[in-house]
């Protein structure tokens, strides 16, 4: 029975190009969509750019352009990636559109009428220089647990501590460096903790769709059970802050001037907005298509890092706004390289654009991913050696090899005509039964199982072909009797029929190659459908090369840093280039000593200098002038240890003689990066000790 499916992938954030994780998710969804279409189902496959939020606003501001211009720039890149990897969305949209504004505001009003929106006054850090409230990512400070500097406002990257921004020691704005102040503001909350939401989510997260497929994979269901609460019935869900204060690039909240929807509210609504835009183009009834009581199945492909939003907030929002809830949430893991997290600095980052630019076949990657992806929430590992071996062995050595060998005999000796001597073919009969298992594996997203079964049949075809030894029969074909000719034609025809069946089964994974096989090799006027696997071909065109082997050297090129990064100007530590190299003998000429600041006072008539009286362990005190007045109060330096250039020639100044130089650090551009930092040795160092 034909089904109607509405399929989406997670929306990429429109402040950057696609990365390999996006491509993996789109390939996974595209394979599924193609397999469902081949089964005769109607699929509406849409995507969109996630175009709102503070990061986009701030990046655009930094570049001196509008947020809309920034979003448009990245949107213009999308087709190059999608077309390059044969990913075929029906429609690509944006969340910064009239459809998304209208739908987001409609859903909000519906939730408000249900009593599920509540206004509360909350206290947040506010940047008085920037004039905006700060999200956790824009607040930095000292970790309250391990005292590591420059940690973000919600967690420490050094010790792993999780905390509230207000717990940071000496917090500062990552945008301006200013000390943030606590300020109150009214925010809007979606009451996810409401008993109605909790009861619904307990049912939905454990439920199944019309096909009997669970809404959530087992691993995801287990995670939502943790979030929803234990058997004691204690509620664990917190309410969700769905608002942000101006300035903010987003959708305004109705009847709330200066308030905007948090990007995570309007982003998933973008799925619906994209479908609505698509329906307008195609003349489809959007409301009928997404009627909660209608037959359309709503399916989302997402990564494991955004489960919370999609498995709790999203279905609850839709349910109590009177809209259709998702039928299936398909969650995948991340990509690793040789068992490790990808890292550009370690040379293990994969740029999808570089993959295409160096001439690698997109269908190599589609096949490799399919061979490793399954329906579980597992990371997919890209191993370069395995990639080369699997593509060359499976696709070229097994699959394409069948056609290249068998078609040559048919073209040379039978003018492209295929003929089958007898009605029985044990291999074909076996594969006819196996085909249903392969189709089911694709529908269940068990792509690795489907690929294994397909390649196992390719092995059987090659083994049967080798056992028959058609090249032996072909040697004397000119003088051969009719039975021998018929036998040769039958062997090669059945091998090509098997190749066609394999091509049908691989079509969701290798759409471009399968289309060439259908149209160029077998003369079809349409791409393959599942039923074509059992149809015996009658003619074959002269064989044309279908796929190159992977050159391992390409993998070396793939993992090189992108050209733009390689040619970028070298980083300037502290705002200036490193000085020319010196020898150890040059360094030895500089006598650096520990000194204790015995006294410190301002210099009358100078706006920059402080006069330091130093003990360097010589039995006398030294007098040193230092331009650090803007950074330090004299009394704060008394008793501190510092480092002195002790053998610097005395310098006669307007205010007296300076007998050395105290070491301090600063940025080359003091206006852009203000701050002077006197070097202070660790406790235990004594005046007079040499710094070596």
UniProtKB/Swiss-Prot annotation:
Residues 586-692 form the tRNA-binding domain. It catalyses: tRNA(Met) + L-methionine + ATP = L-methionyl-tRNA(Met) + AMP + diphosphate. GO terms for molecular function: ATP binding; metal ion binding; methionine-tRNA ligase activity; tRNA binding. It comes from the Bacteria. It is found in: Cytoplasm. One of its GO terms (cellular component) is cytosol. Zn(2+) binds at residues 143, 146, 156, 159. ATP binds at residue 344. Its EC number is 6.1.1.10. Binds 1 zinc ion per subunit. SUPFAM superfamilies: Anticodon-binding domain of a subclass of class I aminoacyl-tRNA synthetases, Methionyl-tRNA synthetase (MetRS), Zn-domain, Nucleic acid-binding proteins, Nucleotidylyl transferase. GO terms for biological process: methionyl-tRNA aminoacylation. Its cofactor is Zn(2+). A motif ('KMSKS' region) lies at residues 341-345. Keywords: Aminoacyl-tRNA synthetase, ATP-binding, Cytoplasm, Ligase, Metal-binding, Nucleotide-binding, Protein biosynthesis, RNA-binding, tRNA-binding, Zinc. A motif ('HIGH' region) lies at residues 12-22. Is required not only for elongation of protein synthesis but also for the initiation of all mRNA translation through initiator tRNA(fMet) aminoacylation. Belongs to the class-I aminoacyl-tRNA synthetase family. MetG type 1 subfamily. Homodimer. This is Methionine--tRNA ligase. The lineage of its organism: Bacteria, Pseudomonadati, Pseudomonadota, Betaproteobacteria, Burkholderiales.
């Amino acid at each position: 029975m034909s089904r109607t499916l509405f399929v989406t992938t997670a929306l990429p954030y429109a402040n950057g190009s696609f990365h390999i994780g996006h491509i993996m998710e789109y390939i996974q969804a595209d394979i599924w969509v193609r397999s469902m279409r081949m089964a005769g189902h109607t699929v509406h496959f849409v995507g969109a750019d996630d175009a709102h939020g503070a990061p986009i606003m701030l990046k655009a501001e930094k570049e001196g352009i509008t947020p809309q211009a920034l979003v448009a720039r990245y949107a213009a890149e999308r087709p190059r990636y999608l077309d390059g990897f044969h990913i075929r969305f029906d429609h690509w949209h944006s969340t910064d559109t009239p459809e998304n504004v209208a739908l987001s505001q409609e859903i909000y009003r519906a939730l408000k009428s249900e009593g599920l929106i509540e206004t509360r006054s909350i206290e947040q850090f506010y940047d008085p220089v920037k004039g905006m409230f700060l999200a956790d990512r824009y607040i930095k400070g000292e970790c309250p647990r391990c005292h590591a500097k420059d940690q973000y406002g919600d967690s420490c990257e050094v010790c792993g501590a999780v905390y509230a921004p207000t717990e940071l020691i000496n917090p500062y704005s990552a945008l301006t460096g200013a000390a943030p102040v606590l300020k109150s503001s009214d925010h809007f909350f979606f009451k996810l903790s409401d008993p109605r939401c909790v009861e619904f989510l307990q049912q939905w997260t454990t439920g199944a769709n019309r096909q009997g497929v669970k809404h959530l994979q087992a691993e995801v269901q287990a995670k939502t059970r943790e979030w929803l609460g234990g058997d004691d019935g204690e509620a664990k869900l917190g309410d969700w802050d769905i608002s942000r204060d101006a300035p903010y690039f987003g959708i305004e909240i109705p009847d709330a001037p200066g308030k905007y929807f948090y990007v995570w509210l309007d982003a998933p609504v973008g799925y619906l907005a994209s479908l609505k835009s698509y329906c307008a183009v195609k003349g489809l009834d959007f409301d009928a298509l997404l009627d909660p009581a209608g037959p359309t199945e709503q399916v989302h492909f997402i990564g494991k890092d955004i489960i919370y939003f999609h498995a709790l907030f999203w279905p609850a929002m839709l349910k109590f706004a009177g809209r259709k809830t998702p039928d299936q949430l398909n969650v995948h893991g991340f990509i690793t390289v040789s068992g490790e997290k990808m890292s550009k600095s370690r040379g293990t980052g994969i740029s999808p654009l570089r993959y295409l630019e160096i001439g690698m076949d997109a269908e190599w990657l589609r096949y490799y991913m399919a061979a490793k992806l399954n329906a579980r929430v597992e990371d997919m590992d890209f191993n370069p050696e395995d990639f080369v071996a699997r593509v060359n062995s499976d696709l070229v050595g097994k699959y394409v090899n069948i056609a290249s060998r068998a078609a040559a005999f048919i073209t040379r000796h039978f003018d492209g005509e295929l003929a089958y001597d007898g009605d029985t073919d044990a291999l074909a009969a076996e594969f006819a039964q196996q085909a249903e298992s392969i189709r089911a594996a694709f529908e269940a997203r068990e792509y690795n199982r489907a690929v294994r079964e397909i390649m196992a049949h390719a092995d059987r075809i090659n083994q049967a072909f080798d056992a028959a030894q058609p090249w032996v029969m072909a040697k004397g074909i000119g003088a051969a009797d009719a039975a021998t000719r018929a036998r040769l034609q039958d062997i090669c025809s059945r091998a090509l029929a098997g190749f066609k069946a394999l091509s049908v089964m691989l079509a969701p994974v290798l759409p471009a190659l399968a289309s060439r096989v259908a149209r160029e090799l077998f003369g079809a006027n349409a791409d393959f459908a599942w039923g074509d696997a059992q149809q015996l071909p009658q003619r074959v065109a002269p064989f044309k090369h279908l796929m190159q082997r992977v050159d391992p050297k390409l993998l070396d090129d793939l993992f090189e840093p992108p050209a733009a990064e390689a040619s970028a100007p070298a980083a300037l530590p502290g705002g200036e280039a490193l000085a020319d190299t010196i020898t150890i003998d040059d360094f030895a000429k500089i006598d650096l000593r520990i000194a204790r600041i015995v006294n410190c006072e301002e210099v009358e008539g100078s706006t920059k200098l402080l006069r330091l009286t130093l003990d360097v362990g010589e039995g006398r005190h030294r007098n040193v002038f230092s331009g650090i007045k803007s950074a330090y109060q004299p009394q704060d330096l008394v008793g501190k240890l510092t480092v002195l250039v002790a053998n610097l020639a005395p310098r006669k100044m307007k205010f007296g003689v300076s007998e050395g130089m105290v070491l301090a650090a600063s940025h080359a551009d003091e206006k852009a990066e203000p701050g002077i930092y006197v070097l202070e040795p660790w406790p235990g160092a004594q005046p007079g000790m040499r710094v070596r």
